[in-house]
Design a protein with these regions (language model features):
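Blade-loop segments of beta-propeller domains
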Residues: 1-26
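Repeated scaffold domains used in trafficking and secretory/extracellular systems
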Residues: 12-20, 55-64, 116-119, 182-185
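N-terminal regulatory/sensing modules of transcriptional regulators
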Residues: 45, 62-63, 68-69, 89, ...
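Long, internal scaffold/assembly segments composed of regular secondary structure
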Residues: 95, 106-123, 127-131, 142-143
Length: 220
């Protein structure tokens, strides 16, 4: 089936950033580059309605229900205090969750490290889960709060703030050296296991891909 078409009319889009799906209600949510989320019927591809999101630089999103949106913001400037907005179909911001790991970039330039496989939000059953690469905690996102679900203690492999690419202010040579000992991990949850793919931030081992499995029942 086709999901609408390119263009500027209702339900159309030029480009899209991400898709979310609610299999229970049979809806597809498409984050477009026009600041809207287009909603389509999964079975037919029919356009139903759109949802305006806050006029912010949204990196990713997840639907808490069919009209309530959680949008995630990257901290490319070092001073992006807001990390997640909860908003309604009419663009009203209902809640904001803040970050505390702020830093200064001397030049004032905004730097961004992001790839197409990065995933900050995912679904597990009826939960919306969220984890940043720079954060050791996986949260469950609700309208009212971020609920800690898992804490991943990376110990000596957790990257310090001043070793982040954004904090190095474009000095790739320095970054490639000081960030090399640290790892970044993602999380995928199933009923029995946590899958944690990881790789090093920089250096010779950056392209190597590793995987850790955690047995939820055995707790090991």
């Amino acid at each position: 089936r086709n999901i609408r078409s390119r263009g500027g009319g209702p339900g159309q889009f030029n480009y899209f950033q991400q898709i979310d799906v609610n299999e229970d209600t049979g809806l597809i949510f498409m984050l477009t580059t026009s600041g809207k989320i287009n909603v389509y019927e999964m079975e037919t591809g029919k356009f139903l309605y759109d949802i305006k999101i806050p006029d912010k630089e949204t990196a990713q999103f997840a639907m808490l229900n069919d009209t309530l949106v959680a949008t995630f913001m990257l901290n490319s400037s070092g001073q992006q205090k807001e990390r997640i907005y909860i908003s309604s179909q009419k663009e009203n911001i209902l809640n904001t969750f803040y970050r505390s790991d702020l830093f200064e970039v001397k030049s004032g330039t905004r730097w961004l490290m992001m790839s197409g496989i990065d995933r900050y939000m995912f679904r597990y059953k009826d939960l919306i889960c969220y984890k940043e690469f720079y954060n050791d905690t996986l949260f469950v996102v609700t309208e009212k709060e971020l609920q800690p679900r898992y804490i991943f203690d990376l110990g000596k492999y957790s990257i310090p703030i001043d070793c982040r690419m954004e904090a190095c202010d474009g000095d790739w040579k320095t970054y490639n050296t000081i960030a090399a000992p640290y790892i970044r991990n993602q999380v995928i949850e199933t009923d029995s296991l946590l899958f944690m793919p990881y790789n090093y931030w920089a250096g010779e081992k950056q392209r190597e891909r590793h995987m850790v499995l955690y047995d939820k029942k055995a707790k090991e």
